Amino acid sequence: MKKDKIFNAFIIEIIILCGIIKKVNGELTDMIRKLQKTDINQVSHIWLNTNLKAHFFIPEQYWISNYEFVKEMLPQSEVYVYENNNKIQGFIGLKDDYIEGIFVADEIQSHGIGKKLLDYIKNKKAKLQLNVYQKNVWAILFYQRERFIIQSEQLDELTGEKEYVMNWESNFKR
């Protein structure tokens, strides 16, 4: 029994060192975990607000009209949330090796949460792909900083906006 406790404490310390969770005064305060049904309202709210702000070049009605559909699809997707003090502050959605999107609450953007979510997924996948609107300059710079490379350009037929297809590959063979 004592060995189990020591082993579990050791594993938690390794996870903390990897930046997946943090300890403050002996308490776990933030973590990345799989989406739960009880998270849907918080996550869909972040999805809508982030899209409205980041994609100002797309009519608001486009995002608002897709809100309910996204709420229905979230439980069927591979989604990981970043939670701090029981509040979801961001999430990443995937379909196989394709990143559907990284979304961080407006008030906490540029605090490293998007990077933590992306690093978490990079540790699980050997390669990743995503599409990003060409007018979303901050997102493009973020992905390039994270070693994503523009592979091609295409038109998003739903919005009429040009987008880049970007790829990332791990340096390590899995």
Feature roles, as predicted:
Residues 31-45:
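A short beta-loop-alpha structural element at the N-terminal edge
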Residues 45-71:
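Conserved GNAT-fold acetyl-CoA-binding loop/helix
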Residues 78-90:
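Conserved beta-hairpin
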Residues 98-109, 132-133:
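A short, internal acetyl-CoA/4′-phosphopantetheine-binding micro-motif in the GNAT/acyltransferase core
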